[in-house]
């Protein structure tokens, strides 16, 4: 079974989503299906078909989350050290073209959220950063052309 590296908070978020789906979404959709069934002929009952479609989505997401959680390999970034970029690191970068400073944490695929500053370990940027140190420059392929970043600092925890 493939292991999914992730941080503790990432695992907690997935577990919370799973609990929510099982305790709130699943019972609500079962009630919605029962209500739609009470309206009679199911062949032309849009509410029923919509509820069944939603149920299928919810059950699929539950199965996906259960698989991810069972294969999670939690890595605690606070136990890591050094100045080399690796999983869990907070990396301060400067975009060499715009001089804009950004900080990203390298996290697992299932917890990445660019708006929150968390990038997937499998993203082009993270792949180019892994193994590098402050002062190194990396070039990352982007839709508008390659972008260059200088690593300013690497932190853990």
From Swiss-Prot:
Read off the Pfam families from this record. Answer: GreA_GreB, GreA_GreB_N
BP GO annotations: DNA-templated transcription elongation; regulation of DNA-templated transcription elongation
Which spans of this chain does the record mark as coiled coil?
Answer: 46-73
What keywords is this UniProt entry annotated with? Coiled coil, DNA-binding, Transcription, Transcription regulation
Q: Membrane spanning segments where?
A: none
Entries under NCBIfam families matching the protein: greA, PRK00226.1-2, PRK00226.1-4, PRK00226.1-5
Sum up the protein's function in the record's words.
Necessary for efficient RNA polymerase transcription elongation past template-encoded arresting sites. The arresting sites in DNA have the property of trapping a certain fraction of elongating RNA polymerases that pass through, resulting in locked ternary complexes. Cleavage of the nascent transcript by cleavage factors such as GreA or GreB allows the resumption of elongation from the new 3'terminus. GreA releases sequences of 2 to 3 nucleotides.
Record's protein name: Transcription elongation factor GreA
Species for this entry: Acidiphilium cryptum (strain JF-5)
Q: Output the lineage of the source organism.
A: Bacteria, Pseudomonadati, Pseudomonadota, Alphaproteobacteria, Acetobacterales
Originating gene = greA
